[in-house]
Swiss-Prot record:
Keyword RNA-binding attached: yes
SUPFAM superfamilies found in the cross-reference section: RNA-binding domain, RBD
Gene3D superfamilies for the chain: 3.30.70.330, 6.10.250.1170
The entry's keywords: Coiled coil, Nucleus, Phosphoprotein, Repeat, RNA-binding
Protein name in the entry: Paraspeckle component 1
Lineage: Eukaryota, Metazoa, Chordata, Craniata, Vertebrata
GO CC annotation terms, alphabetical: fibrillar center; nuclear speck; nucleus; paraspeckles
InterPro entries referenced in this protein's UniProt entry, alphabetically: NOPS (IPR012975), Nucleotide-bd_a/b_plait_sf (IPR012677), PSP1_RRM1 (IPR034522), PSP1_RRM2 (IPR034523), RBD_domain_sf (IPR035979), RRM_dom (IPR000504)
Gly residues bias (residue ranges): 497-514
Domain of life, source organism: Eukaryota
Annotated organism of origin: Gallus gallus
Skewed-composition ranges (Polar residues): 471-487
Function in brief: RNA-binding protein required for the formation of nuclear paraspeckles. Binds to poly(A), poly(G) and poly(U) RNA homopolymers.
Similarity remark: Belongs to the PSPC family.
Intracellular or extracellular location(s): Nucleus speckle
Amino acid sequence: MAANRNLKQVRIENSSPAAPLGMVGGGGGLKGLRGLETENEAAAMALVPGKEGGDEEQEGGFTIDIKSFLKPGEKSYTQRCRLFVGNLPTDITEEDFKRLFERYGEPSEVFINRDRGFGFIRLESRTLAEIAKAELDGTILKSRPLRIRFATHGAALTVKNLSPVVSNELLEQAFSQFGPVERAVVVVDDRGRATGKGFVEFAAKPPARKALERCSDGAFLLTTTPRPVVVEPMEQFDDEDGLPEKLMQKTQQYHKEREQPPRFAQPGTFEFEYASRWKALDEMEKQQREQVDRNIREAKEKLEAEMEAARHEHQLMLMRQDLMRRQEELRRLEELRNQELQKRKQIQLRHEEEHRRREEEMLRQREQEELRRQQEGGFKPNFMDNREQEMRMGDMGPRGAINMGDAFSPAPAGNQGPPPMMGMNMNNRGTLPGPAMGPGPSMGPEGAANMGTPMMPDNGTVHNERFPQGGPSQMGSPLVSRTGSETPQPPMSGVGTVSGGPGGFGRGNPGGNFEGPNKRRRY
């Protein structure tokens, strides 16, 4: 039976006139089975279970699929499927109690208190529990009518101050952190608008107590708005069965109040006066409640406005803090960047200094190497230059640097030294052949001391304009011997070195720069 409990066969005895079937369509399932009016226990057992096979029974019955009694998303064996059975016989056994509900599916919880005559049983779905309650309530069992009600949900909580955007799913998800939730519902009005209230049903009492304590001590928020929910134990009301007449206790007060039937009080009577005072009291209560509700609503609106302003200010503060944090990060990054640039600059300066030092070292080494080379080969170039100078002075002809004599510069007398040439003392030329210049015989026409052959014979008819005509001739031929003492001539500067040439090897100026009162050129 446990393997095939989702498929039950209920056979209704056609011969029983007191067992009609009432089918109420609601939500796609069977709402209730009514019309079972039995007088004894045998009549209460008129509904017998059918066969447990998977095939439908065709003989005087119909098949009920228990799965069809579960609504979409409904959980099975919840607290809402729990029934309270009162006025039980004291000698009833657990097997008899189960057999009483076995036609409505496999129960999961069975509890019997024989001393007080009540018990609890939990069925698979709410619909099956409603069917069992409708069928078995008032049934006579061992001369006792059974009283069946839905058991009070001990793990249900009322949730208030809900936001309009909270749904059933969000409410269940929020309270699932405390324990398994069987059902969570947000209460709405007739137009489907949220009333700000709801309830949550847990599977057991410990999670419900935990949720109640946590929400009472702290502030439990369901949305972004800092609006905490208010959790309270759920008040249990029976708004289905109510209080039937058969359950009323027939006390003295009951009989006294039932003496007068329902009626309207007549104006001017005692009843009308006090009835009016009761109505005034109710009206005052209503007005005060409305005023309290209005004050609470205004306080809530004011609090919401302050909360919005404070949240805006809080967001601005967070943005400022974030901006300051980012500025601090940027400043730190800028400092790191500046430090890195400073390090790179220092490294670059060190590299440049090292490069400059290496260049200076290379230049100094090059200079030292050049100086060393000059010191090693310095004497040989000087010797060669002197040798070349001597060779040039010995090989030059009549128009050379030494044979510069002409009609205007005759050779000196035997006791007369050669004139200095641009500061060069001819007497100091130790390398020239022949005796030193001075008194004595003059050298030949090609000699170093002969200043060249005369360009004009000295016949005494041509005189130099630079000198007085009465003076002795100084332009004579070197071959003519001179007698007597003659006054030495002043040194001539007409013969000199070529500008830029080595000393002693220059050629005479063709134009001749003659010092004296007359500086015209002579040709």
